[in-house]
């Protein structure tokens, strides 16, 4: 039984390959080109490393599909005022979608990645996604949109590892990753500057408009709604008698809505594009949710109605950004499901 390991050239995917090989698994490397090389092409270095480890490497070109399924929706989301999460979309459509298909095409039964998350077997639910043990690197949030059937074929060797230990074990083996530095937040956005990326792509974005308080008072002008995210404080460019936060975006009237800290209190959010990883009838009444990465889970009650998730927080929270992911957990850190945030509770 062959396991294909998605090889980016970085520390995590390389150690995932090393671990599986040392466990006696039959493995091969699989590298996907998601974006055209703009500088140094990592493939020769990845191939050399695989040769050193005695592993075959397969390279698949997915640049056109990545543009269609990840980059284009990313740009379209900003055009309508959303704050997209391209990594979650990439996991669902590319890594565990088309790349997993490519793994099957080369004869692999499973696809392993360097994600910091765990997969467990449950007597009723089958494969269950669970948070990784390293709280600083846990990536279960980004995996909550991956269909259950795809997770059944996934392997996460690093789920029980911490990043510092991974680096140390590679060093102990005298293995240097081809790309030893941490990858940037969004792989296709140079320097993580999404504003420059959108401008370079000549995306038609909403222009300047008024900044209005929650009481209806105009207090300034914004540079374009696409440049702001719900809950944002910095970058408003307004001197005011109290700190101001973005509390909403009125796309129809091109208005940026701001208010003080008290205006941030949101009772919950609604999510669409729902992905159930555990049958909804098995969800507990009280769950934990995350509405942004690196956030401590929030106690909430979540209902599924008409294909949408309605999350009501136990304590009011800053508003959830439209386009981000709502990930739902039980108290044992199993991921019950996820969705794309549509807006606040009605």
UniProtKB/Swiss-Prot annotation:
InterPro entries: MnmA-like, MnmA-like_C, MnmA-like_central, MnmA-like_central_sf, Rossmann-like_a/b/a_fold. Disulfide bonds join 90-187. Its EC number is 2.8.1.13. Residues 137-139, 292-293 are annotated as: Interaction with tRNA. CDD domains: MnmA_TRMU-like. The active site is at residues 90, 187. It is found in: Cytoplasm. The keyword Iron-sulfur does not apply. GO terms for molecular function: ATP binding; tRNA binding; tRNA-uridine 2-sulfurtransferase activity. GO terms for cellular component: cytoplasm. It comes from the Bacteria. Catalyzes the 2-thiolation of uridine at the wobble position (U34) of tRNA, leading to the formation of s(2)U34. This is tRNA-specific 2-thiouridylase MnmA. It comes from Nitratidesulfovibrio vulgaris (strain DP4) (Desulfovibrio vulgaris). The lineage of its organism: Bacteria, Pseudomonadati, Thermodesulfobacteriota, Desulfovibrionia, Desulfovibrionales. The gene is mnmA.
């Amino acid at each position: 039984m062959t396991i294909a390991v998605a090889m980016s050239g970085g520390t995590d995917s390389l150690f995932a390959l090393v671990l599986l090989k040392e466990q006696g698994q039959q493995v091969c490397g699989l590298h996907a080109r998601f974006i055209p090389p703009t500088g140094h092409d990592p493939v020769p270095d990845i191939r050399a490393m695989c040769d050193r480890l005695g592993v075959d490497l397969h390279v698949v070109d997915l640049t056109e599909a990545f543009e269609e399924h990840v980059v284009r929706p990313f740009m379209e989301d900003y055009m309508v005022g959303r704050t997209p999460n391209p990594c979650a979309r990439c996991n669902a459509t590319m890594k565990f979608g088309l790349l997993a298909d490519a793994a099957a095409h080369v004869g692999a039964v499973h696809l392993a990645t360097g994600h910091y998350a765990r997969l467990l077997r449950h007597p009723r639910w089958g494969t269950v996604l669970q948070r990784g043990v390293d709280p600083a690197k846990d990536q279960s949030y980004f995996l909550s949109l991956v269909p259950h059937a795809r997770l059944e074929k996934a392997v996460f060797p690093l789920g029980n590892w911490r990043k510092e230990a991974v680096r140390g074990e590679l060093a102990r083996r005298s293995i240097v990753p081809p790309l030893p530095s941490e990858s940037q937040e969004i792989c296709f956005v140079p320097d993580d500057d999404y504003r420059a990326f959108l401008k370079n792509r000549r995306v038609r974005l909403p222009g300047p408009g008024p900044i209005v308080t929650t009481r209806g008072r105009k207090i300034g002008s914004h540079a374009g709604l696409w440049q702001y995210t719900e809950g944002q404080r910095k970058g408003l460019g307004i001197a005011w008698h109290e700190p101001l936060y973005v509390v909403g975006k009125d796309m129809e009237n091109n208005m940026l809505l701001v208010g003080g800290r008290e205006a941030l209190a949101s009772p919950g959010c609604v999510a669409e594009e729902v992905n159930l990883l555990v049958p909804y009838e098995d969800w507990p009444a009280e769950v934990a949710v995350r509405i942004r990465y690196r956030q401590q889970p929030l106690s909430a009650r979540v209902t599924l109605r008409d294909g949408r998730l309605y999350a009501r927080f136990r304590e009011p929270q800053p508003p959830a950004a439209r386009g981000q992911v709502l990930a739902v957990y039980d108290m044992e850190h199993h991921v019950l499901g996820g969705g794309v945030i549509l807006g606040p509770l009605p």
